[in-house]
């Protein structure tokens, strides 16, 4: 796979299923949550990926019954996520480890699909500079980056209601999750998300959905990639009990 941004196939998939996705009164719904290229294309983790304590391979899972709180501060406000290890032990262990080591700090929400999802977490091409913006080269590739490793899939045992936080992945490629994640904006997204792929569910937004909605309402490219034109960075990401 090339390093260029891969066109999401959400609306194409919906059409192939013989149905038109209707979310929030809009037909089409934009692109599905999609990760970057396979880890096999990267010989080492991106040098800008957080701190030296970040994992370089799939970290230990969270145990069933173990929960964590991930707090994301952005210029738009604060988003608090309750992560539940019982939903997806492998994915939650990975997400919490990346949040704790600083990987997500300075990384943007790069895709905005109104009425559907917002997506972020590309630490390879989605990390802002000192000016709070992406470089021109990164802006052209944001959303196509990868972590340097991928993690195994977890089974999905619940559904994608508004506020659900889940891992993005490459369409039709099992075990392709890395660092990118998305937040569901609308209950109506659930059926189409399940039809398209199983995306490991990390937990749910416990506070700050108004902030998520505000980010989703910002301008995007208006094409199936739904790239944020002025992507919002995660200025601080911390983990608590």
For each predicted feature, which ranges?
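Cyclophilin-like peptidyl-prolyl cis-trans isomerases
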Residues: 2-13, 18-241
């Amino acid at each position: 796979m090339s390093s260029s941004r891969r066109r999401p196939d959400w609306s194409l998939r919906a059409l192939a299923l013989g149905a038109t996705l209707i979310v929030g009164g809009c037909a089409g719904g934009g692109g599905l949550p999609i990760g970057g290229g396979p880890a096999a294309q990267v010989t080492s983790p991106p040098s800008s990926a957080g701190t030296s304590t970040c994992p370089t391979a799939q970290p230990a899972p969270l145990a069933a019954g173990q929960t964590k709180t991930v707090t994301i501060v952005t210029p738009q406000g604060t988003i608090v996520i309750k992560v539940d290890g019982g939903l997806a032990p492998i994915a939650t262990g990975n997400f919490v480890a990346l949040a704790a080591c600083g990987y997500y700090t300075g990384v943007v929400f790069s895709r905005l699909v109104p009425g559907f999802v917002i997506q972020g977490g590309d630490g390879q091409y989605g990390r802002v500079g000192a000016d709070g913006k992406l470089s021109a080269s990164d802006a052209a590739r944001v959303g196509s980056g990868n972590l340097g490793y991928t993690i195994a899939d977890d089974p999905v045992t619940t559904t994608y209601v508004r506020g659900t936080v889940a891992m993005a992945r490459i369409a039709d490629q099992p075990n392709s999750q890395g660092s990118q994640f998305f937040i569901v904006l609308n209950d109506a997204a659930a059926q189409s998300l399940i039809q398209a792929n199983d995306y490991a569910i990390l937990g749910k937004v416990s506070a700050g959905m108004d902030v998520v909605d505000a980010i989703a309402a910002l301008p995007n490219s208006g094409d199936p990639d739904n790239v944020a034109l002025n992507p919002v960075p995660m200025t601080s990401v911390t983990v608590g009990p």
